[in-house]
Regions:
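Alpha-helical transmembrane segments of multi-pass membrane proteins predominantly involved
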Residues: 1-509
Length: 509
């Protein structure tokens, strides 16, 4: 393969990297100008008009870079290999690269209005570098490249979580996320090393062929379990979810939105490839009448624990961001249902659900960002009377909460419907009925705390001190447009779910 062909196949990632470098350069130059102005005036540097303009230029370059990256993905061939198969191009990888880049696009839009960020150029550059990690993850079918993508993504997310130096909770969130993320990486790397030692390969297809011909040995089983534990940390599945509440609450809101959405999409895509392609021969069975050892029972237990713990603990939350964090734990359990089913339909349902969930979470965090800028907090009481202050935001938040609860005709309902249908058909003789029952129980419980949020928005009286100035409304305009766009996407995908579901099903086949 010539260098020109290699550049064409790697164009989406290259465009995002170049955009990150340009954004970083603009941000650094604007800081230098501000620092020189501060020294010459013998006063601390303030956010001057040039700094505001530089922030706008950084956002514009980031948005244009992501848009060009999407166009570059659309121009990729249907199937291709890079670096000897370490990276692959398939309809599935191309589709989810677009989804990940689109989520990064909306995160940049939310970050544009985040006034607490003192260095927006560096922040946007880190978002772009994290997006490169997402694209490498989605496009990889080789364990070594998967680990590289995980580390590039993880290092970026740790910095994003701790980026607000004026807030001690942000530092706490970054530290906890770093400690748990490092533990996750250690488990994943140790598991990969054991799998490589027992199979002699890091390619998923080769590993599958090897596992189909040799008996399962204790070291190999240990490697599989440790790899699954590492990914359980990444998707915040119980009991490996302890980092999520503090990270979601303490991190800057765009960071929390990105961690909750894009990183989970890529993690579920990769986890599905690993268990269904690489570990396929070790599937086992999670049926209540025919339990067989394998990775499927492990994921089934993680799913059940996540659904029960996430939903029950969410009932006690009074902070909306912590509520969304424990809700994310429960939704990780729902999403694992499709992988436990193990079929093509199950994997497709998992991918559809995680995409819908990611869109919904970015929108919900967008509403939280506007409310926080108006009231200074993100507790339930800060959402009181939102319907009177901003009917648009209240309506959008209602769409997001009801979609998360799985209420028709919103997209979240069809996501759960596809997951439950795939699980019901798997295993023979309704073997996964017990897990579906747990998921239905969790869905009923979750409806209560989602309605609590809507009660605060539409029923409770607003605080006397809550008011929005015209300047504040103008500064939050981009966030409001972003939230409205995401709410419209949830409505559209609820009315026409096959628009996305059929594409995913065709890409998986």
């Amino acid at each position: 393969m010539s260098y020109l062909e290699l550049l064409k196949l790697g164009a989406p990632e290259a465009v995002v990297v170049i955009s990150a470098l340009v954004v970083l350069a603009i941000g650094l130059m604007s800081q230098r100008v501000s620092a020189v102005a501060g020294v010459s005036s013998a006063k601390p540097p303030k956010k001057t008009a040039s700094a505001v303009a530089a922030t706008g230029w950084c956002s514009l370059v980031a948005v244009l870079g992501l848009a060009i990256a999407i166009a570059a993905v659309l121009m990729l061939p249907r199937n291709a290999n890079l670096f000897g198969g370490m990276l692959v191009i398939t309809p599935l990888t191309s589709l989810f690269k677009i989804i990940c880049v689109a989520l990064a696009f909306f995160t940049v839009c939310l970050a544009r209005s985040e006034k607490s960020l003192r260095h927006p150029g560096e922040y946007l550059a880190i978002i772009l570098l994290a997006t490169v990690g997402l694209m490498l993850l989605v496009g990889s079918e080789e364990l070594l490249m998967i680990f590289i993508g995980l580390e590039l993504l993880g290092l970026s997310l740790y910095v994003m979580a701790a980026f607000d130096k004026t807030d001690l909770r942000s530092a706490e969130a970054g530290l906890k996320y770093f400690l748990f993320g490092s533990t996750s990486s250690a488990f994943t790397l140790f598991g990969i090393s054991l799998i490589y030692g027992m199979s002699g390969s890091t390619g998923l297809v080769t590993i599958s062929e090897k596992l189909a011909t040799v008996p399962v040995q204790p070291l190999l089983a240990t490697g599989v379990v440790m790899t699954l534990i590492g990914f359980a940390f990444k998707i915040a599945a119980a009991p490996f979810h302890l980092w999520a509440p503090d990270a979601y609450q303490g991190a800057p809101i765009p960071s929390a939105a990105f961690i909750a959405s894009a990183s989970k999409v890529a993690s579920f895509v990769v986890l599905g490839k690993i268990v269904l392609v690489g570990f396929g021969p070790l599937h086992g069975s999670s049926g209540w009448h025919s339990m067989v050892a394998g990775w499927s029972p492990v994921l089934a237990v993680l799913a059940a624990l996540s659904i029960v713990i996430g939903n029950l603990v969410a009932l006690a939350q009074t902070n909306v961001r912590r509520l969304l964090a424990y809700s994310a734990v429960a939704h990780a359990g729902y999403t694992l249902l499709g992988l436990v089913a193990g079929s093509r339909d199950g994997f497709s349902a998992t991918l559809f659900y995680t995409a819908i969930y990611a869109i919904t979470l970015v929108g919900a965090f967008g509403v939280v960002a506007v409310v926080r800028s108006e009231t200074g907090g993100d507790d339930l009481k800060d959402f009181s009377g939102l319907a009177g202050r901003s009917p648009l935001l209240a309506g959008c938040m209602a769409i997001f909460m009801l979609s998360l609860a799985g209420i028709p005709p919103l997209a979240g309902f069809f996501g759960k419907f596809y997951l439950f249908s795939a699980a019901l058909r798997a295993g023979g003789n309704y073997g996964l009925l017990w897990l579906i029952g747990v998921a239905l129980f969790g869905s009923f419980v979750s409806l209560y705390y989602y309605l609590i949020v809507l009660k605060a928005i539409f029923v409770d009286e607003p605080p006397v001190t809550t008011r929005s100035s015209p300047d504040q409304l103008r500064s939050d305009l981009l966030q409001r447009i972003t939230v409205a766009t995401l709410a419209a996407a949830i409505l559209f995908l609820g009315l026409m779910p096959d628009t996305l579901a059929a594409r995913i099903l065709a890409a998986v086949s």
